[in-house]
Amino acid sequence: MKVELDSFSGTKIYPGRGTLFVRGDSKIFRFQSSKSASLFHQRKNPRRISWTVLYRRQHKKGISEESAKRRTRKTVKNQRAIVGASLELIKERRSQKPSDRKAARDVKLAKDKEAKKADKAARKAEKAKSAAAGAQSKVSKQQSKGAFQKVHATSR
């Protein structure tokens, strides 16, 4: 036994009951009663008519005893070690007081600044050394013999 559904109200239509309405675009609508057919032709919205299945579904009627509320699982935060930091190290850093952390940061920054300064001074000394050596070695054989030096144009 094939049971159809009313296109408007959503109620069951048993064999031998109801009517068919075929629209101009060949879409078929089945109605259980002339009441639902009439409301369909008046272009009424079944969600706003209280006795239809769509209305009852939208307003959660008659299903409260059927399905209990679904429980959602609570997320639990878990501490894990990451690359370059063990779990103990992370816990130790977390337990540090902000003032201690700030002091450690300042010490590290000062140390880095000193290292950068020393590196810069070393590079400057190296550059000066190479410049002094370079000035002597840049003279070619021709120039050392007293050959004519080309004068570069200073104006355009």
UniProtKB/Swiss-Prot annotation:
Pfam families the UniProt entry points to: Ribosomal_L24e
InterPro entries, alphabetized: L24e/L24_sf, Ribosomal_eL24, Ribosomal_eL24-rel_N, Ribosomal_eL24_CS
One GO BP annotation of this record: cytoplasmic translation
Region (Disordered): 87-156
Comp. bias regions, Basic and acidic residues: 89-129
Any GO MF annotation of the entry: mRNA binding
Disulfide bridge partners, by residue number: none
Presence of the UniProt keyword DNA repair in the record: no
Domain of life of the organism encoding this protein: Eukaryota
Keywords from the named record: Ribonucleoprotein, Ribosomal protein
PROSITE patterns from the UniProt entry: RIBOSOMAL_L24E
GO CC term (a single one): cytosolic large ribosomal subunit
Lineage of origin: Eukaryota, Fungi, Dikarya, Ascomycota, Saccharomycotina
Biased composition (Low complexity): 130-147
Listed name of the protein: Large ribosomal subunit protein eL24
The family this protein is said to belong to: Belongs to the eukaryotic ribosomal protein eL24 family.
Species assigned in the record: Debaryomyces hansenii (strain ATCC 36239 / CBS 767 / BCRC 21394 / JCM 1990 / NBRC 0083 / IGC 2968)
